[in-house]
Every structure is written in structure tokens, then in C-alpha cells.
């Protein structure tokens, strides 16, 4: 059992702000969301807004896998064994790590799943896990956008590594070029944010993930967003869909 957090050294203002945040969140409806869309479609821009607005936890499977491996949890140990052998981590392991993450207090009002499921089999396994918990996916937000628009978006993208905040030299520039607005720390460009890598990733997306959209469409859960619009207009669409 994890040791209880020592709150005595936490500044009173921080405690009050967190208490007020939780009181505000208590009146929000529970939501379990999946974000689907090709790289550069705006998921990374919208997910923090959705997370804060609806008091959800953001579950990025890649980050969770790395955290589980680093923490040497039972599932993390199994995942590391697969990685060390050069194997893909099994769908059951990933779903298990999502299951564990959902037990955190920050996930009590629901979650945003980003980067999973990527295949219909993964979607089915996720549904089975949620059904055992007496819950289900409420909405799948499909960030629909034409491939031709994505190259300009991708090659101009800059990231703040520790927070995940994303910027764009043309569409959403930081106040100071190359610097995060909040912390003042330097921004980076991902190594795979190139036209060549984008083409490969789009081919994989269309082949693997579009059947997932069809799977959830048959359950009447998919909301198609006009992801080519400016971020504020996409945010307004999201709010309308989730209201």
C-alpha cells in the first residue's frame, strides 16, 4: 500500500485551490472519451482543454507503459520482458495498465484515452474490461482532417517535453519563439515530425485505425470533428458534442 502523502508542507493556497477544483469537479458529469485522429490532427492541443474542462484524467498509453516499467509494477515487469525481447507489448497488458490507471483519484470523473485503441481487437478488449467494471466508452472524438493539410502542421510543430504542451510556428506560436509560455523552458521538435515519417504514419493510421472508427460508428459513439479548423473553433465543436 502506498504511503499517504504528507500534506503538512503543501502551501495552504495550493491546498485551497485543489479543494475548490475538486468541489467544482464534483458537479461535472462522468465522461469516458477516446480521441482518434492522424498525427497532427490536433488531439494534443485539445486533450488538455478537455481534461481541465471536464475534470478527466489523460491516459496516454505510451507514457503509462514507460511509467509502469520504471515503477516495476507487476504489469510493468511483464511489459519490460516483452520489450527486452524486441516483442510488442500484448493488448492484454496494455488494457491491464489502463485498468490500473483508472483506479487513480484523478480518474474518478472519467478519462481521455489517447493512442489507444489502434486496432479493432484492442477496442474489443477495452470494451470487455470496461464492461466488467460496469461502465463503457461514452464518446469517440474523431479528429477528421485531409492528409494534404497535415504536412504543414506537422513540420511546424514544437513541443514542451515535460508538460506535453504543443505549439506551431504558424497556427499557435509561443509568445517567445522556441520558448514555453508557462515555464520559459526551451521547446523541441520531435525527430519524427518530418514529411517522410508523416507519410509512413498516415499509411499505418489509415490501415489500422480507420477500422476502429467504423467499429465505434456502429455503436453510434463517433463524433466527427472538423479538425482542419482553427483550435478555438475545434474546441467549440468539442464542447457542443459533449454538452
UniProtKB/Swiss-Prot annotation:
Cellular location(s): Cytoplasm
InterPro entries linked: Adenyl_kin_sub, Adenylat/UMP-CMP_kin, Adenylat_kinase_CS, Adenylate_kinase_lid-dom, P-loop_NTPase
Alphabetized PROSITE patterns for the sequence: ADENYLATE_KINASE
Residues binding ATP: 40-45, 157
Region annotation LID: where it falls in the sequence: 156-193
Molecular function (Gene Ontology), one example: adenylate kinase activity
GO cellular component entries: cytoplasm; mitochondrion
EC number: 2.7.4.3
Reaction it catalyzes: AMP + ATP = 2 ADP
Matches recorded under HAMAP family: Adenylate_kinase_Adk (MF_00235)
Protein name in UniProt: Adenylate kinase 4
Native species: Oryza sativa subsp. japonica
Amino acid at each position: 500500500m502506498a504511503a499517504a502523502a504528507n500534506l503538512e508542507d503543501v502551501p495552504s493556497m495550493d491546498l485551497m485551490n485543489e479543494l475548490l477544483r475538486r468541489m467544482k469537479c464534483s458537479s461535472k458529469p462522468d465522461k469516458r472519451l477516446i480521441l482518434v485522429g492522424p498525427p497532427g490532427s490536433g488531439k494534443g492541443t485539445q486533450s488538455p482543454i478537455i481534461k481541465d474542462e471536464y475534470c478527466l484524467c489523460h491516459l496516454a498509453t505510451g507514457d503509462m507503459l514507460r511509467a509502469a516499467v520504471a515503477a516495476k509494477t507487476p504489469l510493468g515487469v511483464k511489459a519490460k520482458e516483452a520489450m527486452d525481447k524486441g516483442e510488442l507489448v500484448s493488448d492484454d497488458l496494455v488494457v491491464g495498465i489502463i485498468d490500473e490507471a483508472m483506479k487513480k483519484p484523478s480518474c474518478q470523473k472519467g478519462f481521455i484515452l489517447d493512442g489507444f485503441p489502434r486496432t479493432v481487437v484492442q477496442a474489443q478488449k477495452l470494451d470487455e474490461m470496461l464492461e466488467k467494471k460496469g461502465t463503457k466508452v461514452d464518446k469517440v472524438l474523431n479528429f477528421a482532417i485531409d492528409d494534404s493539410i497535415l504536412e504543414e502542421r506537422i513540420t511546424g510543430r514544437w513541443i514542451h517535453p515535460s508538460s506535453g504542451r504543443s505549439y506551431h510556428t504558424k497556427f499557435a506560436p509561443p509568445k517567445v519563439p522556441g520558448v514555453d509560455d508557462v515555464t520559459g523552458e526551451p521547446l523541441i521538435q520531435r525527430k519524427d515530425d518530418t514529411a517522410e515519417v508523416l507519410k509512413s504514419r498516415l499509411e499505418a493510421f489509415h490501415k489500422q485505425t480507420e477500422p476502429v472508427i467504423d467499429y465505434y460508428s456502429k455503436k453510434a459513439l463517433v463524433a466527427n470533428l472538423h479538425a482542419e479548423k482553427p483550435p478555438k473553433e475545434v474546441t467549440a465543436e468539442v464542447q457542443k458534442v459533449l454538452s
